[in-house]
């Protein structure tokens, strides 16, 4: 199971390391959406973690709320 988690988390890590530093910061929440996804998958498993991350990404838009939103 840990290998499958690592495979799912790897693209998030690549984004955080290779792409995010060169993009304009646009996430309205703390932690960022990618950090939230990483933590949600580690804490809740792959299926629920991806579900929570997807819901979070859909909430992250210019007309939405902002602020501290930790993984529950």
UniProtKB/Swiss-Prot annotation:
GO terms for cellular component: plasma membrane. It is a peripheral membrane protein. Keywords: Cell inner membrane, Cell membrane, Membrane. Pfam families: YidD. It comes from the Bacteria. HAMAP family: UPF0161_YidD (MF_00386). Belongs to the UPF0161 family. This is Putative membrane protein insertion efficiency factor. It comes from Amoebophilus asiaticus (strain 5a2).
């Amino acid at each position: 199971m840990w290998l499958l988690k690592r495979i799912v988390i790897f693209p998030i890590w690549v984004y955080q390391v290779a792409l995010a530093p060169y993009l304009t910061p646009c996430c309205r929440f703390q932690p960022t959406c990618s950090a939230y996804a990483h933590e949600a998958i580690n804490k809740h498993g792959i299926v629920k973690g991806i579900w929570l991350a997807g819901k979070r990404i859909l909430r992250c838009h210019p007309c939405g709320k902002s602020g501290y939103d930790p993984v529950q």
